Amino acid sequence: MGTEATEQVSWGHYSGDEEDAYSAEPLPELCYKADVQAFSRAFQPSVSLTVAALGLAGNGLVLATHLAARRAARSPTSAHLLQLALADLLLALTLPFAAAGALQGWSLGSATCRTISGLYSASFHAGFLFLACISADRYVAIARALPAGPRPSTPGRAHLVSVIVWLLSLLLALPALLFSQDGQREGQRRCRLIFPEGLTQTVKGASAVAQVALGFALPLGVMVACYALLGRTLLAARGPERRRALRVVVALVAAFVVLQLPYSLALLLDTADLLAARERSCPASKRKDVALLVTSGLALARCGLNPVLYAFLGLRFRQDLRRLLRGGSCPSGPQPRRGCPRRPRLSSCSAPTETHSLSWDN
């Protein structure tokens, strides 16, 4: 049983996607979890398929629009927006596998299990880290218009940051890539994360803590710091667009906290129990399992919401999307074709207007 002590009921990037009918946790009595298992089989496929449909459609449009407009290399934010859409698109591609596994069991073998689990984990982490990159880009875009502001980032530097983010995400995905496997459970094949017997509880807990710290705490800290500075700039600015830009800032931070904070807290509490080898009563263990299922589903929702928050709110993106749907595209040269928007010049006088590009008109 020791090898399965960290198997959780969520299909998140820290665990397998199914629970045991009998708990593998250190419980004071045998705990039969058929009711939790039944809830998981109903809840997980519905959430996975809904988010997959929204994520594939929304992020597919973002990728197609940016590539058609050839704006991906013009600014760091455009480059990171493209990477964010790619990460969310890859994440959405893994969700139908989770839904099928929950409904009828896993039938694709251990190699595919490790591949899908690793892709899920890497894209999940990459998405949150690119959100932090976009926040930092927005702060630099405003601060560089001020006296003694930081030097603007170059597209080449943005591409280097993107490579680092993906490498870090792959590092965080190593447990899923190495230890996910196909196995029999209660008469059905399951794709689960099962740590080797020789791995201590401390190592398992430290892995989960590192993922929460880098996958949630770091991006949240960067977002709050950058948007707080941007909010202060907006409060000092004048113009009719100031209030709308402030609402965008609040919406971005609030969406991140509401969607990801509950799952991160639930996972931290579960990790604390693991590290302390704390015993739970059967009802408490069931409540924890349901909480992990529901909050991990909530965390997945940002895969479908990111295109709305970070792209569709942008005026220039909507213009590019309409042009794409009409079958046109814009060249990337200094003299754009008729109907293609010009990139505004940034000056100290235009800082409030550039701040309004918090709706990501880049």
Swiss-Prot record:
Residues 69-78, 137-159, 226-247, 314-362 are cytoplasmic. The keyword Manganese does not apply. GO terms for biological process: calcium-mediated signaling; cell chemotaxis; G protein-coupled receptor signaling pathway; immune response; positive regulation of cytosolic calcium ion concentration. It is a multi-pass membrane protein. It is found in: Cell membrane. The chain crosses the membrane at residues 53-68, 79-99, 115-136, 160-179, 204-225, 248-269, 291-313. Receptor for chemokines SCYA27 and SCYA28. Subsequently transduces a signal by increasing the intracellular calcium ions level and stimulates chemotaxis in a pre-B cell line. This is C-C chemokine receptor type 10. It comes from Homo sapiens (Human).
